[in-house]
Structure formats: structure tokens, C-alpha cells
Amino acid sequence: MNLNATFFAQMVVFFILWWVVAKFIWPPLVKALDERAKKIADGLAAAEKGKAELELANKRVDQAMAEARTEGAQRVADAEKRAQLTADEIKQNAQAEAARIIAQAKAEAEQQATRAREALRDQVAVLAVKGAEQILKREVNAQVHADLLNQLKAEL
């Protein structure tokens, strides 16, 4: 191998270039690459965090929807129960009112029947007295007696 001055000059230039690159170019380049790697890592971490938050939010939404469905079903059941109770109460009130009206009608019918019996008794008593008067006014014989009884029957 031939070692001459050119070779040594090239080595000196190479080391100077290496020193300049190592001193002025390499640190900013490494810094830029590190910053880029950090931004990428931060972006991936933010994406993972966002994904986890999205899953958590979806779980909360699903839970809230389930609670809303349960609450809605409970409200519907309560409303149906109240409606049934109200319907039963209305039915009982209607039955009680019907029983009251029937009892009142029976009482009125009995009162009318009692009044009719009393009126009939009064009329029968009056007729009996009239019949007795007529019998006593006339002479008592069988033919007159039969005629008076027939007349009383006709009046009744």
C-alpha cells in the first residue's frame, strides 16, 4: 500500500468532516428524530387513551340505556297497576251504587205495596160497614141477603 501525503490529507479531511458532523449536524438530527419518535409515541398513547375512553363511554351509555329501559318498564308496570286498581275501584263503586239503587227500589216497592194494602183494608172495611148497614136496614131474608152479597161481590 502506498502511503503518501494525499492519503494523510484525506484522513485529516475525513476526521475534520466527522468532527463537524458529530459536533454540529448529528445532535440536531438525533434531536429531531427523538422529537419525531416522541410525537409518534404521544399520538399512539393518545389514540389508546381515546379508545379506552370511548369504550368506557360506550359502557356508560349501554348501562344508562339499560337503566332507562328498566325504569320505563317499571313505570309502565306501575301505570298498569294503577289503572287496574282504578278500574277495580270504579267497578266496586258501580256495584255499590247498583246495590243501593236496587235496595232503594225494593224499599219504594214495599212502601207502595204497604200503602196499597192499607188502602185496600180501608176500602174493605168501608164496604163491610156499608154491607152491614144495608143488611140491617132491610128485612133479613135469604133472597135479600143473597142479593146484597152479590152486590158486594160486584163492588169488590
From Swiss-Prot:
CC per GO annotation: plasma membrane; proton-transporting ATP synthase complex
Intrachain S-S bonds: none
InterPro entries noted in UniProt: ATP_synth_B-like_membr_sf, ATP_synth_b/b'su_bac/chlpt, ATP_synth_F0_bsu_bac, ATP_synthase_B_chain
Coiled coil: none
Annotated keywords: ATP synthesis, Cell inner membrane, Cell membrane, CF(0), Hydrogen ion transport, Ion transport, Membrane, Transmembrane, Transmembrane helix, Transport
One Pfam family linked to the record: ATP-synt_B
Sequence intervals crossing the membrane: 7-27
GO-annotated molecular function: proton-transporting ATP synthase activity, rotational mechanism; proton-transporting ATPase activity, rotational mechanism
Subcellular location, record wording: Cell inner membrane
Superkingdom to which the source organism belongs: Bacteria
Annotated family: Belongs to the ATPase B chain family.
Assembly description: F-type ATPases have 2 components, F(1) - the catalytic core - and F(0) - the membrane proton channel. F(1) has five subunits: alpha(3), beta(3), gamma(1), delta(1), epsilon(1). F(0) has three main subunits: a(1), b(2) and c(10-14). The alpha and beta chains form an alternating ring which encloses part of the gamma chain. F(1) is attached to F(0) by a central stalk formed by the gamma and epsilon chains, while a peripheral stalk is formed by the delta and b chains.
Described purpose of this protein according to its UniProt entry: F(1)F(0) ATP synthase produces ATP from ADP in the presence of a proton or sodium gradient. F-type ATPases consist of two structural domains, F(1) containing the extramembraneous catalytic core and F(0) containing the membrane proton channel, linked together by a central stalk and a peripheral stalk. During catalysis, ATP synthesis in the catalytic domain of F(1) is coupled via a rotary mechanism of the central stalk subunits to proton translocation. Component of the F(0) channel, it forms part of the peripheral stalk, linking F(1) to F(0).
PANTHER family in the cross-refs: ATP SYNTHASE SUBUNIT B, ATP SYNTHASE SUBUNIT B', CHLOROPLASTIC
Protein name: ATP synthase subunit b
Organism expressing this protein natively: Cupriavidus taiwanensis (strain DSM 17343 / BCRC 17206 / CCUG 44338 / CIP 107171 / LMG 19424 / R1) (Ralstonia taiwanensis (strain LMG 19424))
Gene this chain is encoded by: atpF
